[in-house]
Amino acid sequence: MDKLIIGRYIVGDSFIHRLDPRSKLLAMLIYIIVIFWANNPVTYAVITLFTLFLVFLSKIKLGFFLGGIKPMIWIILFSTLFQVFFNTRGNVLWSIGFFKITEVGLNQGWMIFLRFILIISFSTLLTLTTTPLSLSDAVESLLKPLTIFKVPAHEIGLMLSLSLRFVPTLMDDTTRIMNAQKARGVDFDEGNIIQKVRSIIPILIPLFASSFKRADALAIAMEARGYRGSEGRTKYRRLLWNCRDTLSIIAILALGLILFYLKS
């Protein structure tokens, strides 16, 4: 649990670190759209190389990105196997009972697997190179035009910032509670599935109690400092869009055009 990557920021001075957080969020949105354009091995090879190049530019060890994938591995495998065994379209390559592996199912399976890996890797890159406060400011800035439609841009940004900030804290609390339970003789690895699920209850109850206490303390602290929402607030740190941010957006749009060409 203490190795969960999401919500953690690694201090650095790489090209990716210096990008405006708004350009990173826009790039991620375009990146996700581009990934769903890819539909053959060549397009996925191109986007994988592009992602590895971004990892290289970030100057962050590859192990951190593998750490971002690890908590999601069971969901990735389940989604992949579901496509492989339950997609009945196309020529049947192998079958046993209700399970069939078809050409289309196998093709969809490996594409879904890579989509998960690539999207999680880019999301991990975003959180590792951008502070939660910067992400919050970026979301608020991008949503500000929607305030004319009564969209609470500041509140959405604040919720994102608090969520990212408290994920590592909750994981640390979970690790601490599990270690305390193990010291009392609890073995989380023994027994059948039902017994393992039951063993989680002694973790959830104190974790919820700790979460409510932290939320209450945070609310009191914000009120004590005179927090009243976005009205009349100014910012000490201002976001600055420059040439490298424009080039980054152009680069990922160029990637999309390349994939669109290779796809057709």
Swiss-Prot record:
Give a GO molecular function annotation for the protein.
riboflavin transmembrane transporter activity
Q: Does the keyword Transport apply?
A: yes
| Record's signal peptide | none
Taken from the UniProt record, the cysteine pairs bridged by disulfide bonds within this chain are: none
Provide the topology term for how it sits in the membrane.
Multi-pass membrane protein
Its domain of life reads Bacteria
Per the record, the major location class is: membrane
The entry's cellular-component GO terms read:
plasma membrane
Q: Its quaternary structure?
A: Forms a stable energy-coupling factor (ECF) transporter complex composed of 2 membrane-embedded substrate-binding proteins (S component), 2 ATP-binding proteins (A component) and 2 transmembrane proteins (T component) upon coexpression of the components in E.coli. May be able to interact with more than 1 S component at a time.
Q: Write the protein's name.
A: Energy-coupling factor transporter transmembrane protein EcfT
Asked if the keyword Hydrolase belongs to this entry, the reply reads no
The alphabetized list of GO BP terms reads: riboflavin transport
Q: Which UniProt keywords apply?
A: Cell membrane, Membrane, Transmembrane, Transmembrane helix, Transport
Compartmental location = Cell membrane
Transmembrane segment boundaries: 27-47, 62-82, 109-129, 240-260
**Which HAMAP family is this protein grouped with?**
EcfT
This molecule's function is given as: Transmembrane (T) component of an energy-coupling factor (ECF) ABC-transporter complex. Unlike classic ABC transporters this ECF transporter provides the energy necessary to transport a number of different substrates. Expression of the complex plus RibU in de-energized E.coli allows riboflavin uptake.
InterPro entries in the cross-refs = ABC/ECF_trnsptr_transmembrane, EcfT
